[in-house]
Amino acid sequence: MDSLQLWQRYCDWLYYHPGLEIFVDISRIRFTPPQVEALRPRFAQAFADMQALEAGAIANPDEGRQVGHYWLRAPELAPTPEIRQAIQDSIERVETFAEKIHRGTIPASGGGRFTELLCIGIGGSALGPQFVAEALAPLHPPLNIHFIDNTDPDGFDRVLGRLADQLGQTLVITTSKSGGTPEPRNGLVEVKLAYQKAGIPFSAHAVAITGPGSQLEQQARQEGWLEVFPIFDWVGGRTSETSPVGLLPAALQGIDIRALLAGAATMDEATRLPHLERNPAALLAMAWYIVGQGQGRKDMVVLPYKDRLLLFSRYLQQLVMESLGKSHDLNGNRVEQGIAVYGNKGTTDQHAYVQQLRDGLNNFFVTFIEVLQDREPGIPSPFVEPQVTSGDYLNGLLQGTRQALYENGRDSITVTLPRVDARSVGALIALYERAVGLYASLIQINAYHQPGVEAGKKAASAVLELQRRLLETVQEQQGSLTLPQLAEKLGCPERIETLYWIVRHLHANGRGVLLTGDPARPLELSIQPQPA
């Protein structure tokens, strides 16, 4: 196509939402009219599936659960009065609690207001709040936010080291739907110990966000924590940003959560429309399907041209990959579906991997995120060249990259926001939640469970149980053992490599095992109890 034909294609396929001022452009995806027509029956079913989901159908058949994140920003759509009331109550409780913290009505244990916020969580309990904090937190928030989102001891030390003199002014939120997920539990144990060592009552600083009746809820109530907020059974971690999981940290930072919810609700209305060309999420799902031939053959590279949106690609990694990366479809057929997602930000990436995108392996499509407003209103932009600002350069480099990629046969989508504010970010979250759901219907997979994650947890538990047995055996041993001898003694010669990893880690951390010999020759290493 020449430039005028491309312009006409752009105009023909451009989506614009006048209330949100958001554009979606799929014109640089090379699809044809026959491909679109072939997908219409699939979309008719996808729209019907989505309507049933919102009405309360069991949309997660593997776990027998409803899927209700859309109700969070439109409680009136909830299938029962009880769910509707629970949603409304949770939002009001979040707002009331945040206001009390800001005013000092709930003070820190040593007196004065809380100034720091430490969020302990994993997966969606961290990625959503991190993205929203980076995008929307004011320059001088009422509480400065920090995260523990792993079970890395050095990571704990670094975060707690930064907060060492401020633990007395730090509010700690622990988020875990089940209440027993190892990573947040481990973080909670270590943070609680830090408070005990500092002589500060942890319960006067602690808040839980968890499922009703969970171990975490029981602990919080028994120990008299400040508050417990719910995670509803019908909300998954990766779609929990508009639940207390995301709303509470946002509200405590002074972010307008009502605007966030309103933006999501408005986008939900737009993406509820059962009309392919007039539904922005359907347009995204169609583009993903065609560019990857319905099999995820192309990676999604996310390039937001805005520093505030730096973490959007990490947020989308979980939303897209955990939802769509499935081995079997709804009929039990082995399909190995998924779309790989990665990215950072423009223009940084133009000086990193865009070289490969332009000239190397064509195994991707790009999603550009454009923001029209350069900076906050009232802040002038100086000229860096005659009649050119830094923001003009940002815009020019986005356009230039989009053009250079297309000219070399590389496809792209562009999503344009008017500005980065709570309303736009809420809409962006809702847009991609719906696109993922529609795409999942197109390829007939369950987007709302994560059996692969559970498999990893089970394997980790088996490793830790083997470690306990190993330590007992080594401590009882007189003299030394080789790895094969240890494996034979434990009755698991087939797990010798796992044993090697365990003893190497224990030795490196002074944990009761002494390993001697040449590290390059694992079979010849000598294993014995660490001297007292």
Curated annotation (Swiss-Prot):
Pathway where it operates: Carbohydrate biosynthesis; gluconeogenesis; Carbohydrate degradation; glycolysis; D-glyceraldehyde 3-phosphate and glycerone phosphate from D-glucose: step 2/4
A single GO BP: glycolytic process
Compartment(s): Cytoplasm
Any GO MF annotation of the entry: glucose-6-phosphate isomerase activity
Location (main, coarse): cytoplasm
Active-site residues (renumbered): 322, 351, 457
A Gene Ontology cellular-component term: cytosol
EC nos: 5.3.1.9
Substrates-to-products reaction catalysed: alpha-D-glucose 6-phosphate = beta-D-fructose 6-phosphate
PROSITE patterns: P_GLUCOSE_ISOMERASE_2 (PS00174), P_GLUCOSE_ISOMERASE_3 (PS51463)
Enzyme's top EC category: isomerase
Keywords: Cytoplasm, Gluconeogenesis, Glycolysis, Isomerase
PANTHER family reported for this sequence: GLUCOSE-6-PHOSPHATE ISOMERASE
Matches recorded under NCBIfam families: PRK14096.1
Role according to the record: Catalyzes the reversible isomerization of glucose-6-phosphate to fructose-6-phosphate.
Family designation: Belongs to the GPI family.
HAMAP family, sorted: G6P_isomerase (MF_00473)
Name the UniProt record assigns to this protein: Glucose-6-phosphate isomerase
Native source organism of the sequence: Synechococcus sp. (strain JA-2-3B'a(2-13))
